[in-house]
């Protein structure tokens, strides 16, 4: 079974939300993500889903990426992908949430700020169920694309490599 994973393909990581965490041309990955999904049997969506009371929040971008001292929210970040905001939304042109075969919402708990899609916590003790679901699907290949490469895509790929006996392909849309 081949599974395609859209990692955090949300407006928060695009120029559409310039005050959040925009990735240059991030909004242009939709066509590539849809092409990768066409090669797969199943499709997974991951989404950052943050709370306004998150303990890692800072108001000023100058204060970002500083250690927090918390084990499951290691760095400070400006508000992004807050549930109910434009940044939380999937990119236009992607399927609706109900059209995906499996969904992972990350960072819902204000105490946690995970990067990868396989665990709710940085210490990798609280599974999101993704690895287990992939095993139940008899997955032999995973194609990963999304935003942003340096944190969420990278961590998801590393977790997938440790978590199963499948090939992991990183798409250029990452």
Regions found by a protein language model. Give the residues of each.
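Active-site acidic carboxylates
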Residues: 1-107, 136-140, 158, 162-170
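Amphipathic coiled-coil/heptad-repeat helices and related helical stalk/stem segments
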Residues: 26-29, 87, 126-130, 153
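Short, well-ordered secondary-structure micro-motifs
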Residues: 56, 114-117, 155
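Histidine/lysine/aspartate-rich catalytic loop segments that bind and position anionic ligands
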Residues: 96-137
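A short glycine-rich beta-strand->turn/loop micro-motif centered on a GG-aromatic cluster
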Residues: 143-146, 150, 165-174
